[in-house]
A protein has these predicted regions:
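A short, exposed loop/beta-hairpin motif centered on an aromatic-Gly-Thr core
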Residues: 32-46
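A short, charged, amphipathic alpha-helix used as a generic interaction element across diverse proteins
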Residues: 42-61
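Short N-terminal "domain-start" leader segments
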Residues: 1-25
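Hydrophobic alpha-helical segments and their boundary regions
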Residues: 12, 23, 40-41, 51
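Short, charged, intrinsically disordered terminal tails
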Residues: 63-66
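Surface loops and adjacent helix of pleckstrin homology
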Residues: 17, 30, 52
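Positively charged, aromatic-enriched nucleic acid-contacting surfaces
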Residues: 25-27, 31
């Protein structure tokens, strides 16, 4: 799943992927400067909880879903 966020004309990409062989979920946030923040979790419930935290943090910083 991919979401795009916008803030003052800058774009941020938020991606969730699932590795079927390992079972891990990965959250990758690509910042406007091209740098990435990567987190991995094992369980779907962890993924949901962490995604809510990350998205709320982005919204709190002024990012809006594009």
């Amino acid at each position: 799943m991919i979401w795009f966020f916008d803030k003052d004309g800058e774009k941020l990409r938020y991606e969730i992927s699932h590795n079927r062989s390992s079972g891990h979920y990965k959250v990758v946030i690509t910042h406007p400067d091209g740098s990435e923040s990567v987190e991995e979790v094992d369980e779907p419930t962890e993924l949901i909880q962490r995604s809510v935290e990350l998205m709320n943090s982005l919204r709190g910083d002024g990012w809006r879903v594009a």
